Amino acid sequence: MFAVIKTGGRQYRVVPDDVLEIGKIAGDVGTIVQLGEVLVLGGDTPVLGLPTVAGASVAAEVLQHKRGPKVIAFKKRRRKHSKRKRGYRDEITVLRITEILADGKTPTVGPRPKKEKVVEPAEGEGDH
């Protein structure tokens, strides 16, 4: 099953376990957020929204908040000793799609457990 969602003025085709970089949204790292603007639900019988599919949403886990690459806007007017250089970086949220929900259901999956780091003793330590 897939869905086409709209967030931040852009549309994304998603399936469960997709990792997605979108414009910054509210939510702490590790929490589940719901994206409610579902335009299309695909599968055995596709459902097209007019403009959105009623009762459908997509649940996603917030993996990270970060800043995107620097975009430089440089303007130069030749032979005029005039130039302007500006740059900016977008705020980005990285999401993992956990579930595609139809008919007003709520997410059943909580945040994934974090893997514990196993620290092995270095050679020579431990047998004195």
UniProtKB/Swiss-Prot annotation:
Claim: Cytoplasm is one of the keywords in the record: no
Top-rank taxon, per record: Bacteria
Positions of region (Disordered): 104-128
GO biological process entries: translation
Gene Ontology MF annotations: rRNA binding; structural constituent of ribosome
Keywords for the protein's UniProt record, in alphabetical order: Ribonucleoprotein, Ribosomal protein, RNA-binding, rRNA-binding
One term under GO cellular component: cytoplasm
Keyword Ribonucleoprotein: yes
Bias (Basic and acidic residues): 116-128
Coiled-coil residue windows: none
Function: This protein binds to 23S rRNA in the presence of protein L20.
Family recorded in the similarity comment: Belongs to the bacterial ribosomal protein bL21 family.
Assembly and oligomerization: Part of the 50S ribosomal subunit. Contacts protein L20.
Protein known as: Large ribosomal subunit protein bL21
Annotated source species: Nitrobacter hamburgensis (strain DSM 10229 / NCIMB 13809 / X14)
Name of the encoding gene: rplU
